[in-house]
Amino acid sequence: MEICPFVRLLDWRTLRAADCLTARQSREVDRFAIEELGISSLVLMENAARSVCDWFSQHVQASSSEETSFVVRVVCGRGNNGGDGFAIARLLWTMGYAVEIFATHPEAELAPDARVNAALARKLGIPWREMREFGEAAASARAEDWIVDAILGTGQSRPLSGVLAELVQGMNASLSRRLAVDLPTGFSADAGPGLGNPLTEQPHELVELCVRADVTVTFVTPKMGMLHPGAREYLGETFVASIGLPEKLLREAVSLQ
């Protein structure tokens, strides 16, 4: 079932390694688009955000009644995945959704494109809450609410620990539905979902170090980690979204490596 020309449901039955990109290849696609084709990184970010919002507009109707309203809590990291999140928050807000932003880092510490989209979201007056409030907000959320995970995407390079590990566990414990932008936090583009033990006082207890998404909207192509046997448990219903690159040029970018 296709939602629109730019967002399609992933068919797990036909997924092959040849269909997937590694984290390195994903970075090369972005580099090729920006440096070789001259497409602005902000344009790519906007296209990615619009694809996620296309999914929302098809599946999650904005409520016009306070009695039936729900909240979309967008959790944004410091890098480009966070930039996608700020843009998603802005677009959903203009579409009539009730949105709250939680940022893992101060604006001064954000990557340049993320900072641009954070500033735009600020100017629109979208509610911006302190990160320390997220645990309480997630714990008191209703099943109708949504958490948009825009923390790391394909940018994860090592297992989660500390504050990020606690944040992931808080997301998974929430009644909210969860949508992952590109990949759930803790899900490696190359290796799949993460397990580990950041809790030193319980050295023999394995805990989940990966967001359990109900929906994942991944960009350009599936990722190699999606071939992991346990991947679907963390990705949920998975969609592949275009960011505006023709397939022929995409193949050319990957073949250059």
Swiss-Prot record:
Nucleotide-binding recorded as keyword: yes
SS bond partners: none
Broad class of enzyme this protein falls into: isomerase
Keyword Acetylation: no
Reactions catalysed, as given in the entry: (6R)-NADHX = (6S)-NADHX; (6R)-NADPHX = (6S)-NADPHX
Highest taxon listed in the record's lineage: Bacteria
Residues given in the record as (6S)-NADPHX binding sites: 80-84, 153-159, 182
Domain YjeF N-terminal: 26-251
UniProt-listed Enzyme Commission number(s): 5.1.99.6
Cofactor: binding comment: Binds 1 potassium ion per subunit.
InterPro entries noted in UniProt: YjeF_N_dom, YjeF_N_dom_sf
HAMAP family: NADHX_epimerase (MF_01966)
Family to which the UniProt record says this protein belongs: Belongs to the NnrE/AIBP family.
Protein name, UniProt field: NAD(P)H-hydrate epimerase
Lineage of source species: Bacteria, Pseudomonadati, Planctomycetota, Planctomycetia, Planctomycetales
